[in-house]
């Protein structure tokens, strides 16, 4: 499996690489760690005109700092690849961060791992602008990392009977496996979560129950331990509650196809889950052969 890890040098970027090593993926991994240097984000503080005394010196110092950080990140990423026993390489590119990640992902990548936050030019933690762009513009699956890596023992799988959620189920069955764990002794437990709106239609409840039962049966045959969470309420909120209640290490959800404006649709439910989950989220777009 071709995996792209975006690492900006922040703790989230470093965690993303470690999460890839923790994922119970079946196929051998070929990992490319990407660090993007975006000199276009450089701005002199309080600059109100093109030339201000000291501006040139400041800009040169900032460029030097960016380059030094890139070198540091590349060396650290290489060392982490080796310590995690991952096969791959580290590359540095220049350009807009999100667009460069998307462009690189288009070259045969099957999974992108990105931190939910990162560092901007002033070393402030951004509110996910890069990860938000990536999940809406890459055509492959995306792992959004929110916390330090840990053994993956409990997964919440969001299902609704759509083609997108069926792809998420297939990803667990074909690309991941309960016998391919990297830490922890307990078997992986998948909570199949499905939420129905507050509508008094028995046929809807039966349909929801049928979806959960069908997915559960497939996962049981695949070797997972399975729990069920079929509830009434707002789907995104109920999935987030299930993740909290079942102490999920990871949420897995599907995504829709390509929209009319060239964005890969995530869907309102998956978007809200990615934005508000307490744990990392895997957004599945394609099932790896």
In which residue ranges do the predicted regions lie?
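Short Asp/Glu-rich motifs
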Residues: 43, 100, 125, 154, ...
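Glycine- and acidic-residue-enriched helix-capping/strand-helix junction motifs
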Residues: 64-71, 201-209
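Charged, low-complexity surface patches
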Residues: 70, 123, 208-209, 232, ...
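Gly/Ser-rich helix-loop-strand patches that form or flank binding pockets
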Residues: 2, 17, 22, 26, ...
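Small/aliphatic-rich secondary-structure junction motif
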Residues: 1-57, 84-86, 150-207, 213-229, ...
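Structural beta-alpha unit
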Residues: 12, 22, 38-41, 57, ...
């Amino acid at each position: 499996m071709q995996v792209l890890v975006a690492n900006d040098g922040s703790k989230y970027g470093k965690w993303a690489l470690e999460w890839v090593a923790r994922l119970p993926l079946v196929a051998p991994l070929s990992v490319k760690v990407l660090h993007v240097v975006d000199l276009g984000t450089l701005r002199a503080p309080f600059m109100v005109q093109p030339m201000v005394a000291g501006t040139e010196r400041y800009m040169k110092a900032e460029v030097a700092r960016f380059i030094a950080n890139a070198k540091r990140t590349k060396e650290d990423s290489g060392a982490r690849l080796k310590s995690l026993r991952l096969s791959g390489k580290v590359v540095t590119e220049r350009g807009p961060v999100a667009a460069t990640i998307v462009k690189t992902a288009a070259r045969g990548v099957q999974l992108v791992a990105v931190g939910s936050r990162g560092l901007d030019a002033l070393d402030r933690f951004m509110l996910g602008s890069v990860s938000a762009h990536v999940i809406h513009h890459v055509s492959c699956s995306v792992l959004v990392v929110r916390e330090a890596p840990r053994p993956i023992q409990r997964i919440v799988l969001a299902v609704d009977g759509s083609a997108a959620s069926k792809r998420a189920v297939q990803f667990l069955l074909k690309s991941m496996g309960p016998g391919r764990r990297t830490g922890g002794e307990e078997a992986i437990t998948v909570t199949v979560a499905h939420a129905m709106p507050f509508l008094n239609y028995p046929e809807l409840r039966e349909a929801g129950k049928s979806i959960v039962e069908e997915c559960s049966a497939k996962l049981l045959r695949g070797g997972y331990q399975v729990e069920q969470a079929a509830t009434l309420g707002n789907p995104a909120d109920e999935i987030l509650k299930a993740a909290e209640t079942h102490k999920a290490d990871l949420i897995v959800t599907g995504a829709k196809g390509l929209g009319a404006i060239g964005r890969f649709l995530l869907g309102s439910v998956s978007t809200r889950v990615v934005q508000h989950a307490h744990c990392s989220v895997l957004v599945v777009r394609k099932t790896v052969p």
